[in-house]
């Protein structure tokens, strides 16, 4: 196989607009032949996909897939440029195939390498640096080994680099590029979420044998209690003494006091002048009676 230089890859990219990795693969498949590489890219539908990669994708479709039994579910958003393509049956089929792909890939967490956080990449790099396979090797060799191992590890986490479940000869990324060339618009997998029934819930471990034994023992105890209740003689309770009936004397009803009519105030109170005259007249009258009584005696 002829050596593929970066200059040759760049030249093929400028001619076709395909991605760098696609151009490199095309040159490898064609043994460095430029025309054969262009033909290979056109057959794969990748020659024009790279030119559309920078276009804005604001339309598209959000679709779902529920696996048989309802234990795995997927939500995915795939974008395109126009609603015309979004309503296309081929585009809808593509989105549904991508959702099924996600359901079949439990280790996939990201769409592409660009979506992986830098902290996560550095963590994986440190793990790769601690490998025993690097011991005794020159630093430059170690760096190459780490770079290759890191790329492989990270790609296993990305959806675009997984073999397509319906055709293992191509990746999901190549599948998308084929539809870009066929539908004439840029297509991008934006995001997805995979759901697994019971994921993250701590399940209580139970011993089936112990559980059955406990249930059997409880049933026996209940049966023994019921049998004992049936054979025991009925309890005769003593009659309660009758409550003494006491005749209560009727409470006499209070008798209202007879009201005496009050003297009219007008008879008791007279004019000041009249009061003094009356008093004097009464005195004279009584005095006259006394003198007559003395004469009789």
Curated annotation (Swiss-Prot):
Where does this protein have compositionally biased stretches of type Basic residues?
286-297
Q: Where are the annotated coiled coils located?
A: none
User: Pfam families in the record, alphabetically?
Assistant: EF_TS
Q: Which GO terms describe its cellular component?
A: cytoplasm
Q: Which domain of life is it from?
A: Bacteria
The region called Involved in Mg(2+) ion dislocation from EF-Tu is annotated at: 82-85
Q: Which NCBIfam families match?
A: tsf
Report whether Cytoplasm shows up as a keyword of the record.
yes
Intracellular or extracellular location(s): Cytoplasm
Keyword presence, Protein biosynthesis? yes
Chief location of this protein within or outside the cell:
cytoplasm
Q: Where is this region: Disordered?
A: 223-297
Query: Where is the chain membrane-spanning?
Result: none
**Which PANTHER family does the UniProt record give?**
ELONGATION FACTOR TS, POLYPROTEIN OF EF-TS, CHLOROPLASTIC
**Disulfide bridge positions per record:** none
Which family is annotated? Belongs to the EF-Ts family.
Q: Name one GO molecular function term.
A: translation elongation factor activity
Tell me which species this is from.
Answer: Thermosynechococcus vestitus (strain NIES-2133 / IAM M-273 / BP-1)
Q: What does this protein do?
A: Associates with the EF-Tu.GDP complex and induces the exchange of GDP to GTP. It remains bound to the aminoacyl-tRNA.EF-Tu.GTP complex up to the GTP hydrolysis stage on the ribosome.
Chain intervals with Low complexity compositional bias: 223-265
Q: What is this protein identified as? A: Elongation factor Ts
Q: Which UniProt keywords apply?
A: Cytoplasm, Elongation factor, Protein biosynthesis
What HAMAP family does its record include?
Answer: EF_Ts
């Amino acid at each position: 196989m002829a050596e593929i230089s970066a200059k040759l890859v760049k030249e093929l990219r400028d001619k076709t607009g395909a991605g760098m990795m696609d151009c490199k693969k095309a040159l490898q498949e064609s043994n460095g032949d430029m025309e054969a590489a262009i033909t290979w890219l056109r057959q794969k539908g990748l020659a024009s996909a790279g030119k559309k990669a920078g276009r804005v994708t604001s339309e598209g479709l959000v679709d779902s897939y529920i696996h048989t039994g309802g234990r795995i579910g997927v939500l995915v958003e795939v974008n395109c440029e126009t609603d015309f393509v979004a309503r296309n049956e081929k585009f809808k089929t593509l989105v549904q195939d991508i959702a099924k792909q996600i359901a079949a890939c439990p280790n996939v967490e990201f769409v592409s390498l660009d979506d992986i956080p830098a902290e996560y990449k550095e963590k994986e790099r440190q793990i790769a640096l601690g490998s025993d396979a690097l011991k005794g090797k020159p630093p430059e060799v170690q760096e190459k080994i780490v770079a290759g191992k890191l790329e492989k590890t990270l790609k296993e986490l990305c959806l675009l680099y997984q073999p397509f479940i319906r055709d293992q000869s191509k990746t999901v990324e190549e599948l998308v590029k084929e539809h870009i060339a066929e539908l004439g618009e840029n297509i991008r997998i934006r995001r997805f979420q995979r759901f697994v029934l019971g994921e993250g819930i701590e399940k209580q471990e139970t011993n089936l044998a112990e559980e059955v034994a406990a249930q059997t023992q409880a049933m026996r105890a209940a049966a023994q209690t019921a049998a004992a209740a049936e054979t025991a003689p009925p309890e005769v309770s003593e009659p309660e003494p009758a409550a003494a009936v006491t005749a209560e004397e009727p409470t006499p009803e209070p008798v209202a006091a007879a009201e005496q009519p009050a003297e009219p105030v007008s008879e008791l109170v007279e004019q000041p002048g009249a009061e003094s005259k009356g008093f004097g007249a009464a005195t004279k009258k009584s005095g006259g009676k006394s003198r007559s009584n003395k004469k009789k005696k």
